[in-house]
């Protein structure tokens, strides 16, 4: 029921196979009847022959290395890779790092809504993280790669309540100070930050600013910059799917050459979808 079990299963399976580890593949070339694979280990290069090759090197989010160059050297098309399932760069919640809350988030690119999700938000000094942000990050990265110039993230920390309901709930709260009243919906540290972002003074009285408090629970922040690759779980981009047979994952132009998993231009949301794609494409 945890990731360690998955790793242990892989290790056990690999123990039944002849696997050479700590060897870096430096070249992949066609040869008569199959393929030639050059690998470097301990300063020495060894060449292997194979009738079939399965390219399962993941992406640079996995290793930090651009292993796709082995395939592009053979003339196989690819799309640029950008970080996905990663925190959205944004400093709006600096000072509330580590606070979590449930919200609905809508991502806008150049003023137009492009994606919406609900889930947990994790505040960080330099980013908005958590399940909600991670799932929006794929759309964010793709649109940034395509040239979108500005982004907004509209958060709603009371997504199941209308404005009148929020105001009535706040009005009924025994808490008098405005910023403290937001604990009815969010943790106090986040409520303090939201109130400050909305321009509500620290000494404000709740009953004098119910509309402002309602608006504070529905802030708009501005992510900027590409998510960090080292924080990404996967990337958007990879080897062009049009170059591979969807029934077998074999290259349409090179017999005996296969690609699976994250090496291909496929990515999914959080929740194990990317792992499942790796296993399912490998099973083909």
Give the positions of each predicted feature.
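A conserved FAD-binding loop/helix module that cradles the flavin
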Residues: 56-70, 74, 265-284
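Glycine-rich loop(s) and the adjacent beta-strand/alpha-helix scaffold that form part
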Residues: 52-94
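An anion/pyrophosphate-binding glycine-rich loop and adjacent beta-alpha core
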Residues: 76-82, 87-207
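Flavin (FAD/FMN) cofactor-binding core of flavoprotein oxidoreductases
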Residues: 1, 80-93, 98, 221, ...
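A conserved short coil-to-beta-strand element within the FAD-binding core of flavoproteins
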Residues: 21-35
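Short beta-strand to alpha-helix junction loop
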Residues: 1-12, 60-65, 90-93, 202-209
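A glycine-rich dinucleotide-binding beta-alpha-beta segment and adjacent secondary-structure elements
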Residues: 192-267
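Short hydrophobic core segments
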Residues: 25, 47-62, 71-72, 121-126, ...
């Amino acid at each position: 029921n945890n990731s360690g079990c998955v790793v242990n299963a892989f290790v056990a399976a690999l123990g039944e196979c002849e696997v050479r580890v700590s060897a870096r593949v430096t070249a992949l070339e066609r040869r008569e009847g199959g393929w030639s694979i050059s690998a470097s280990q301990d300063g020495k290069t060894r060449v292997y022959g194979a009738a079939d090759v399965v390219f399962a090197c993941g992406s640079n989010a996995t290793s930090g290395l651009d292993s796709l160059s082995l395939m592009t050297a053979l003339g196989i098309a690819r799309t640029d890779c950008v970080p996905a399932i990663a925190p959205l760069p944004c400093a709006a919640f600096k000072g509330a790092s580590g606070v979590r809350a449930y919200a609905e988030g809508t991502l806008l690119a150049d003023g137009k809504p492009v994606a919406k999700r609900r889930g947990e938000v994790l505040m960080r000094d330099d980013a908005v993280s958590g399940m909600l942000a991670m799932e929006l990050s794929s759309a964010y990265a793709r649109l940034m790669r395509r040239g979108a110039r500005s982004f907004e993230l509209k958060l709603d920390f009371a997504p199941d309540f209308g404005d009148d309901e929020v105001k009535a709930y706040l009005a009924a709260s025994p808490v008098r100070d405005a910023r403290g009243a937001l604990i009815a919906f969010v943790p106090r540290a986040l409520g303090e930050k939201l109130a400050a972002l909305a321009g509500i003074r620290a000494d404000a009285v709740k009953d004098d600013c119910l509309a402002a408090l309602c608006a504070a629970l529905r802030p708009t922040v501005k992510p900027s910059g590409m998510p960090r690759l080292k924080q990404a779980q996967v990337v958007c981009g990879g080897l062009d799917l049009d170059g591979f047979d969807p029934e077998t994952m074999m290259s349409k132009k090179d017999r005996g050459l296969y690609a699976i998993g994250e090496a291909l231009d496929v990515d999914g949301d959080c929740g194990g979808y990317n792992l499942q794609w790796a296993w399912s494409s490998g099973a083909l």
